[in-house]
């Protein structure tokens, strides 16, 4: 994870333009912009000692990701403050282009008062019907991304 960059870093001078696989490295600011451009992401967390991946609709609010959760394993992970990953992507399989962004951080449950305030300002609406939704926050502690670019734009040899 030596190429993971903290969200708070303003400039990145040591990071190469391409990684060893000749994928273009996306800056932290661009990662957040790309995450804001899609409505769905994959929450990756531990459930019963094993990795679990759940599709959720979400919003990026500053350096946090927020989403609704009903009672269950995602909410319990937030109540424990688990470290999780959150992945978003767009892929054009026909043209072999696309990008992926992964954010890592701790989950938390948003208090009822703060959730009410956020719901007034953010256009967050769960895609699933929920009787008792809880607003969950992922505080982004690191973010990294890669872009698959056309062959002509990639370096000819490894970096």
List each language-model region with its residue ranges.
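Charged, gly/pro-rich active-site loop segments
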Residues: 2-23, 85, 90-159
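Short, basic/aromatic recognition patches
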Residues: 17-42
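Amphipathic coiled-coil/heptad-repeat helices and related helical stalk/stem segments
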Residues: 27-28, 71, 120
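Short beta-strand segments
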Residues: 38-70, 86
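Short secondary-structure boundary/capping segments
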Residues: 57, 75-76, 126-128
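Short, acidic/turn-prone active-site loops that include or flank metal/cofactor-
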Residues: 71-73, 90-91
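Short, surface-exposed beta-strand-loop junctions and turns on beta-sheet-rich folds
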Residues: 73-75, 152
């Amino acid at each position: 994870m030596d190429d993971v960059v903290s969200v708070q870093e303003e400039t990145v001078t040591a990071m190469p333009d391409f990684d060893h696989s000749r994928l273009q490295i996306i800056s932290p600011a661009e990662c957040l912009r790309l995450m804001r451009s899609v409505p769905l992401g994959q929450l990756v967390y531990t459930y019963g000692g094993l990795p679990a991946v759940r599709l959720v609709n979400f919003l990026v609010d500053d350096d946090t990701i927020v989403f609704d959760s009903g009672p269950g394993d995602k909410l319990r992970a937030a109540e424990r403050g688990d470290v999780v990953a959150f992945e978003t992507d767009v892929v054009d399989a026909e043209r072999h282009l696309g990008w992926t962004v992964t954010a890592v951080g701790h989950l938390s449950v948003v208090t009822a008062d703060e959730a009410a305030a956020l719901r007034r300002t953010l256009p967050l609406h769960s895609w699933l019907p929920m009787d008792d939704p809880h607003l969950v926050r992922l505080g982004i502690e690191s973010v990294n991304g890669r872009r698959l670019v056309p062959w002509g734009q990639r370096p000819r040899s490894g970096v």
